[in-house]
Structure formats: C-alpha cells, structure tokens
Amino acid sequence: MPAVKVKDNEPFDIALRRFKRSCEKAGVLAEVRRRECYEKPTTLRKRAAAAAVKRHAKKVSREQKKFQRLY
C-alpha cells in the first residue's frame, strides 16, 4: 500500500494528488479490478493466449513496416 507523508504547510489537494500518483505507479487499482470477481483458470489461459496472439501480430506488423520500401 502506497503511503504519502504530508509535509508542513502542504495543501491537502497536492498530497492527495501525490497519493493517487503513487497508487497508479504501484498498480493498486488495476489489481483491485483484476481481483474484483473470480475468474476461472480456463478463462485466464484464454486471456493470456489472446494477449500473446495480439503481441505477436503487433510485432510482425512492426517488422513489416520496418522493411517496407518507401519509393
């Protein structure tokens, strides 16, 4: 859990903004959303496989664009 120490004479808004930023960096909200409800192991595997396919397609697309002739 991220913690923020409020400095002397620091406005609450700025401290809250720093706390939100530290929570975002730590990935707290993403983790909460992921654990919000139970997801079956088969669904997790399907999601991981779909992400791998998407990453591969993106990589191939970038490689095709790199070797594309520009004439």
Curated annotation (Swiss-Prot):
<dbReference type="InterPro" id="IPR038380">
    <property type="entry name" value="Ribosomal_bS21_sf"/>
</dbReference>
<dbReference type="GO" id="GO:0003735">
    <property type="term" value="F:structural constituent of ribosome"/>
</dbReference>
<dbReference type="Pfam" id="PF01165">
    <property type="entry name" value="Ribosomal_S21"/>
</dbReference>
<dbReference type="GO" id="GO:0006412">
    <property type="term" value="P:translation"/>
</dbReference>
<keyword id="KW-0687">Ribonucleoprotein</keyword>
<dbReference type="GO" id="GO:0005840">
    <property type="term" value="C:ribosome"/>
</dbReference>
<dbReference type="GO" id="GO:1990904">
    <property type="term" value="C:ribonucleoprotein complex"/>
</dbReference>
<dbReference type="InterPro" id="IPR001911">
    <property type="entry name" value="Ribosomal_bS21"/>
</dbReference>
<comment type="similarity">
    <text>Belongs to the bacterial ribosomal protein bS21 family.</text>
</comment>
<keyword id="KW-0689">Ribosomal protein</keyword>
<protein>
    <recommendedName>
        <fullName>Small ribosomal subunit protein bS21</fullName>
    </recommendedName>
</protein>
<dbReference type="InterPro" id="IPR018278">
    <property type="entry name" value="Ribosomal_bS21_CS"/>
</dbReference>
